[in-house]
Amino acid sequence: MRCALALSALLLLLSTPPLLPSSPSPSPSPSQNATQTTTDSSNKTAPTPASSVTIMATDTAQQSTVPTSKANEILASVKATTLGVSSDSPGTTTLAQQVSGPVNTTVARGGGSGNPTTTIESPKSTKSADTTTVATSTATAKPNTTSSQNGAEDTTNSGGKSSHSVTTDLTSTKAEHLTTPHPTSPLSPRQPTSTHPVATPTSSGHDHLMKISSSSSTVAIPGYTFTSPGMTTTLLETVFHHVSQAGLELLTSGDLPTLASQSAGITASSVISQRTQQTSSQMPASSTAPSSQETVQPTSPATALRTPTLPETMSSSPTAASTTHRYPKTPSPTVAHESNWAKCEDLETQTQSEKQLVLNLTGNTLCAGGASDEKLISLICRAVKATFNPAQDKCGIRLASVPGSQTVVVKEITIHTKLPAKDVYERLKDKWDELKEAGVSDMKLGDQGPPEEAEDRFSMPLIITIVCMASFLLLVAALYGCCHQRLSQRKDQQRLTEELQTVENGYHDNPTLEVMETSSEMQEKKVVSLNGELGDSWIVPLDNLTKDDLDEEEDTHL
C-alpha cells in the first residue's frame, strides 16, 4: 500500500510542467499574502470556547518542480524550539492558574538570512502571580528547498525576501496545577539540534485547519479527518518527521492516541504518536508540551525529562475542561513493623467507670516509630497470644495518645491468624460430630474425606475375631488342664490297686510279711502314723510295728 502511494506521488511530481523561478522581491507578493497569516489572529477569528484549543495553519504551497534525480531528495529541516521556564525559585515550575489571551507561535521562513524562524510569544496578561512564562526562543534552520504559491523553486543561496509564515493561535484553558519541583539545567538561546527531513505532500493550495478540543480531538484537513476522543492536552508544537518519500508522521510531545484514517485515496499517511520519539543521533534536544498530567521542564542538550503524574483527578465536559485537585486528608499516624502495626488515634472522652490500660513511655511514643517501638509491639502481641507466630499471625494495636505527654492508652489489640488448610482440617476433624449436628454433611481436603470414611472398615471385625480366638484358646487350655489332671489321678489309683491285688495273693517280695488269718482273738489295730493321723489300711509299714508285735508274729510263725 505504501509503495503504491509512493509511486503515485512520484508520477504526480514527474507529470507537472517545469516553472520558471521567480525573482526575489522585497515587496510581499500575492502568494505571500495568501500564505501569510498575521499574528493578530485573535481580532479576526471568532472567540473559541474555553475547553477547546484551535490551531490554524495556512499552507498554500504548490508542487515544486525538481529534476527526476532529485525527486527523492526533497527535504526540509525543522529546528526544535526550546522552551525556557522562569520561576520564582530554581528547580520549581509553577503553572498559571488562569491565563487569558492567545499564545502566538509564528514560523517565518525567509528573510534576510533566508532561514526559517520559529517564535513563541507568551500572553502578557495573567490573573495570578504564579504563572509560567514561556521565554521567546528563536531557532534557525537551513532548508534545502522552499516552495511558494506560483510553484517557483527558491534556494537558500538566492537570498530572496519572500516569506512563508505560519501563525498558530493557542488558547489555554483555566486549570489549576500543583507546584512541582524539577531539576533545572542551564539553557542557551540556541542549541545544536539535528535537522529532520520532511517530505512535502502534494497539495493544491487549500487552507488546513486543525482543531483540538477537550472532550474530542478533531484534526480537519481537506480530504481526510482524524478524530481522537478524550484529549485534554494543549498542543504547543508539532514536529514533522520524514518516514518515506510519500509518507508523513505527525509527532506531538503530549500523550495523544493514534488517530485512524476515515477516507481513502490520500497520498500521505499521517500517524499521531503517543509520545515524542527521540534518538541520540537524530534529536538530541526535544521540547515538551504541558498537558493535564505533565509540567514544562527545561531540556538539556542530551535528554528530555518527563515529570511524574500529579495526584489529581481530571474532569472534562463538552463546554469546559477543568482540573480538580484532591488533597488527601492527613491520616492518623500508623507505625507498621513487618506484619505488626500500631495505629494512634485521638483520645476520646471516656466514662469514669471504664477502666483503661495506660502505658507511660520513657522514650519515644509508639506513634513516633523506631526500633524500640517494634520491640514493644512484639512483646505486647506475644503477651496476648503465647503461641504468636510472626509467619502466620498479624498483630494490630489501636492506641490513643494523650496530648502533651508520652502516655498512650491501649484501646484494642487484634491478632489475625492465617492457618494452612491442613491445620484447619486436623482441627475440624476432631469435632466432626459437632459439625454434623451444626449442618455440615461433608468435608474434604484433597483425597482425604470426613473422619468416618478415613477410619479402617475392618477394625471392628478384627477386634471381635481376636477376642473370640482368645476366649477359645482359654477354653482349650482349661479343658487340657482338666483332662491331664484326671489322667494322672487314674494312673495313681491303678498302681495302688495292683499292689493290693499282689499282697492279697501272697506274691510279694518281703518274706517277713505274711497274711494272717483273721481270728476272734486278733483285733484290727489302728496304727498311728508319723504325722499323728490314724491309719485305716491293713497294710502297715514294718517300721511302724512294735517289737512285741514282731516277736509274737515270729513265734506264731514258728
Swiss-Prot record:
Signal peptide (from-to): 1-22
Tissue specificity remark: Glomerular epithelium cell (podocyte).
Glycosylation sites: N33, N43, N104, N144, N360
Compositionally biased residues, Polar residues: 32-50, 83-107, 143-173, 190-204, 270-302
Keyword Transmembrane: yes
Subcellular location: Apical cell membrane; Cell projection, Lamellipodium; Cell projection, Filopodium; Cell projection, Ruffle
Composition skew (Pro residues), residue ranges: 20-29
Domain of life: Eukaryota
Coiled-coil intervals: none
Post-translational modification, as annotated: N- and O-linked glycosylated. Sialoglycoprotein.
Residue spans of biased composition, Low complexity class: 125-142, 313-324
Major subcellular location class: membrane
Function summary: Involved in the regulation of both adhesion and cell morphology and cancer progression. Functions as an anti-adhesive molecule that maintains an open filtration pathway between neighboring foot processes in the podocyte by charge repulsion. Acts as a pro-adhesive molecule, enhancing the adherence of cells to immobilized ligands, increasing the rate of migration and cell-cell contacts in an integrin-dependent manner. Induces the formation of apical actin-dependent microvilli.
Quaternary structure, from the entry: Monomer; when associated with the membrane raft. Oligomer; when integrated in the apical membrane. Interacts (via the C-terminal PDZ-binding motif DTHL) with NHERF1 (via the PDZ domains); the interaction is not detected in glomerular epithelium cells, take place early in the secretory pathway and is necessary for its apical membrane sorting. Found in a complex with EZR, PODXL and NHERF2. Associates with the actin cytoskeleton through complex formation with EZR and NHERF2.
Protein name: Podocalyxin
Gene: PODXL
